[in-house]
Structures are given as C-alpha cells and as structure tokens.
Amino acid sequence: MRVLIVNTSEKTGGAAVAANRLMDALNNNGVKAKMLVRDKETEDITVVSLPRSLRLQWNFLWERWCVFWHLHFSRQRLWEVDMATSGTDITRLREFQEADVIHLSWINQGMLSLKNIRKIIRSGKPVVWTMHDLWPATGICHYARGCNRYASACGNCPLLPNKGSKNDLSAKIFRRKKELYHRGAISFVTCSRWLERQAKGSGLFVGQRITNIPNPIDTHVFCPQDQAEARLRAGLPADKHIILFVSQRVTDERKGMRYFIEAIDRLVARYPEMKENTSIAILGGHSEEVNLTLPSYSLSYVSDEKQIVAIYNSADAFVLPSLEDNLPNTIMESMACGVPSIGFRVGGIPEMIDHQQNGYVANYRDTEDLASGIHWVLEEADRAALKQACLQKVAQNYSQYAVALKYIEVYNEAMAYKNYKL
C-alpha cells in the first residue's frame, strides 16, 4: 500500500511533527508512505516538496492578504483564520499518481485550496483527512473558543471585526466546505476523543465517517535517560527541581503562559524555599520575553531532536496550561521520557493525563489548582510510580505499532468504500 501524506510544512508546528511521525510509523509497519510538503526542511528522501516557484510564495502571501483585509487590517487574529482560497494542484505529481491513498493533514496557509481538494476527490483516489484542529469542521477558525455557530452554518463570526454578519466570510467558506464534503467521500480522523465530539457537532459533518486515532511517537527516540547526564547536556542545574514549559511560541495566548506565571507566583508565595531549590526551563520561541519569580533558563527554539530529548529528561515536571488543545505532542514527548505532566482539564489533555496516576489535571483556568498540581508532582507524589505510569500509557496508546495498525485499517476501509462507490 502506498500512502501520500500532504502537509504544509515538514517539521514546523505540531501538525507537521505529528504527520512526520505518522509517516515513520507507517514505513516501519509495512506501508510505503511519503510526505508531500510546501516547506521542506531536511534531506529526508521520503519527504517531497512541491516544485519550487514564485507561485507558492504568492499563494501564501495572497491568502494572508485576503485574511488581513477581512480583519480590517488588524494583525490580532491573522493566524487564527484560514480561507483555503489559494493553493496548488497536486494531482499531476508523480507521487500523487503512484499513491493508493491520499492522506491530508494540515494543509492551510496556501498549501491546498478547497478547489484543489475537490480535484483530489474527483481523481477517484481514497482520501483520508486527519484533523489536527477544528478547521475542517468550521468555516474559518482552527479553534472555536466556545463558539458553537459551526453546529449549523457559521456566520456572525467572533473572530471577524464587529462579530461579522450572517453572511460573512465564515458563512461563505462553511457553505463551500459543505458542498465539497457532500460531493466526495472523505474518511476523517481526529487525534483525540475531544476533537471527535467537537467535529460530530458540526453541521458540516452530518453523515460523515469520523474515526479517533491518536498521534504516534517513536519511543526509541523519546525515552528515559539518566537525569544527571541529561542536565549536563542541556546546560541545566544538577541540584534543583526543574519545571519545564515547552511551546513552539511560548507567548502564544492559547498555550496559557499567563496562567503558568500566576501559578508559579502562587507557589513562591506559599513555599518561599522554592526560590532556592527550584528552577524553570522554557523551551520555544520568544522564551527570553518571559519573566518569572523563580530562576529560569531561556532555551529558545531548539530543532535538534537529541537536545530536545535531553531537555525533557532534565525535568521533574512538565507544565502545559493550554486553554484549548487537541492532543499536544509536548505532553506525549514528556510522558515518553517518563516525566509527569500538569495541565488544565480541556481538549484532549485529560485523555493523556490520568489524574494523580501519571500527572495532574487541574481545573480549567484555575491557577490555584495548577499550583497545587505542580507541588503535588514535585513534593508529594511517588515519583517512580508516576514515571512508570507515564511510560505504560505511552506504550499502550501512542506507540508507532499501535497507531499504524489503526491507520492501516482506516486506509483499507477507505479503499473498499471507494471501490464500492465506483
């Protein structure tokens, strides 16, 4: 079986990381998988880039300009809205024509347009689409932030100036997606049960096939290491508790840095000795902009996977207070290294963290509870038992083998359904 995974980027962003890991999982379990991207970042021969042209850059810039115009030239929500009006026709590429299954991943920001997806469907090839956020099920947003207008027809979008109108951009794109999905059979996959529930509530997904399969992780790469050696490689203190925060852009409001800072402030007020025995490591872009009441280490953005694994293994606790998230790769990476995680009860996070078994699930936006969770992991819990529970959870749910088998089943069903329809 030949599978072509289509994603905007090869490595940048959580969806790209997940798509890359899925490709590896499939290739290690009997499937011939390749990845087609716009932004190729390595020399990996299983990853193919779109033919280089000025058109690729134009597609990206033109769509961002259109979004900028619809936002009345405000940058505030510029990266929260996608229209899929610009893209590249991939159906003539050799990799497309050789594939048995076309697997769409995160295809926004000028990679594929809705017209391009319609052409993919019309090619007759089975199409599987993994949802890394809610965008395929809404008009224009990736995360609904409590809005449920996508249950019917979108419109009056809270992301648009003055909350849009009944027939605004979100309503128009919603209708285009509805026509697209109605005309073609797509097998949708969500990475979390939370996202599956959200998607099933969409007016776009009435009668659609939706399966829940988590993202995989290579447990031969993300695995426990000696903490003292890991800290030496990461340049972190050997004699402190270390709390880790990781995000591609740590100042991203959705990742909850404000709540992390407030929780740390509460901990320091409650336990002043933490100033002497605890440090914080922050991994990700803009980490130097964060000010904390505990000694902190700004690790900036790191691309070297071995260094990232060393940083995880340096930590005693990993904290991700996301306000909305699907199935965060960072929590999976932390757990695969045997490091317990603390996060809010939101999105797919409670599916990953089993409360007080392999980490701590705090009440949503409750920084007092978040602080209690951090302290519980550092000072009260059985650390060895937590570590073992983390490793067991990952092995049972997120291993390459377990995830690959589930996707192979989806591919076989999609091919059988397509043949039946023909």
Regions found by a protein language model. Name each.
Residues 138-143, 164-209, 217-221, 227:
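A short, active-site helix/loop in glycosyltransferases that binds the activated sugar's phosphate group
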Residues 237-255, 261-264:
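Conserved donor-binding/catalytic core segment of Leloir-type glycosyltransferases
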Residues 275-278, 284-309:
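Nucleotide-activated donor-binding/catalytic signature segment of Leloir-type glycosyltransferases, i.e.
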Residues 310-315:
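Short alpha-helical donor nucleotide-sugar binding micro-motif in glycosyltransferases
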Residues 323:
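Aromatic "clamp/platform" in nucleotide-sugar-dependent glycosyltransferases that forms part
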Residues 340-343:
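Short hydrophobic beta-strand element within catalytic cores of glycosyltransferases
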Residues 355-356, 360-367, 376-381:
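Conserved acidic donor-binding segment of nucleotide-sugar-dependent glycosyltransferases
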Residues 382-397, 406-409, 413:
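A short, well-ordered alpha-helix in the C-terminal region of glycosyltransferases
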